[in-house]
């Protein structure tokens, strides 16, 4: 990892999610997350390697699992993306990751499951609007 990559390069709100980790580990994880952000479009495989390193150090942090899922998705690693995105959704809640989860299912050759997930999201949004 380049020496000029520092934890403070990561958005303060994002770093707040790492407060459950000890300082040294949080710093290392933050630096890996910075690298993921920098490499995601230009080198998806290397971005995924950094996301995996962050996940190994902070597997119970929803943001880290979400980042690992997005990196795997960008690298075309559909099963890994699905695993990580589902874990992030369990940790964080919400429906914002459902489109990526559905598309990962499609990438695995399960378009029916993708449609089912998309419909469940639509149903959830309709129910929320009724409240």
Where would I find each of the regions flagged by the language model?
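Structural motif corresponding to the intra-repeat A-B loop/turn of tetratricopeptide repeats
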Residues: 40-42, 75, 108
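TPR alpha-solenoid repeat register
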Residues: 64, 97-98
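Residue-level signature for tetratricopeptide repeat
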Residues: 38-39, 71, 102-104
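N-terminal leader/linker segments that initiate helical-solenoid repeat arrays
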Residues: 1-31
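Solenoid-like repeat scaffolds
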Residues: 19-24, 52-60, 86-93, 120-128
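Alpha-helical segment of the N-proximal tetratricopeptide repeat
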Residues: 22-56, 67
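Histidine/lysine/aspartate-rich catalytic loop segments that bind and position anionic ligands
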Residues: 100-131
């Amino acid at each position: 990892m380049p020496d000029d990559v520092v934890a403070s390069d990561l958005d303060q709100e994002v770093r707040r999610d790492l407060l459950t980790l000890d300082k040294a580990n949080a710093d290392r994880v933050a630096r890996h997350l910075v690298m993921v952000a920098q490499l995601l479009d230009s080198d998806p495989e290397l971005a995924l390697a950094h996301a995996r390193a962050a996940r190994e150090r902070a597997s119970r942090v929803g943001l880290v699992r979400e980042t690992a899922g997005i990196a795997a998705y960008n690298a075309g690693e559909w099963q890994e993306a699905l695993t990580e995105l589902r874990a992030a959704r369990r940790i964080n809640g919400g429906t914002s990751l459902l489109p990526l989860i559905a598309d990962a299912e499609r990438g695995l050759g399960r378009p029916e499951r993708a449609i089912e997930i998309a419909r469940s999201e639509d149903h959830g949004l309709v129910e929320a609007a009724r409240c």
